[in-house]
Amino acid sequence: MNVVVLLAPGFEELEMVTIVDVLRRAGISVVLAGIVPPPIEGGHGIKVITDLSIDDVGTYDALVLPGGNPGYINLERDQRVLKLICEAYDGGKYVGAICAAPVSYTHLTLPTILLV
């Protein structure tokens, strides 16, 4: 399985690090894709070097969007993020959104989704 974690300025560092750590410990391939060039600064001043640009996202099985303020707002304002979310749903892929991140795409017309 290949997972892409999308990062925008103001992301919640704890939500990003936790999901990346747990998935990698489980042997799952995880890459960090940024909507801006690295480094990307989280909501609490921690800067992260992403693996690639959102423009270079290739094959993946799941997308993960960490929350954070203003991270979730920056995700919502980026049309490339919204396009990837729609493509993921259309392709039967998983989309995980943590904390405030589901707000990023509640305005999209998507099939019924499960929010936990």
Task: Please name every model-derived segment.
Residues 13, 112-113:
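Intrinsically disordered, low-complexity regions enriched for glutamine and histidine
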Residues 1-91, 103-104:
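Extended, subdomain-level signal for the structured scaffold at the beginning of enzyme domains
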Residues 98-99:
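Short, thiol/selenol-centered motifs that function as redox-active sites or metal-ligating centers
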Residues 106-112:
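Conserved small/polar residues in nucleotide/adenosyl-binding loops
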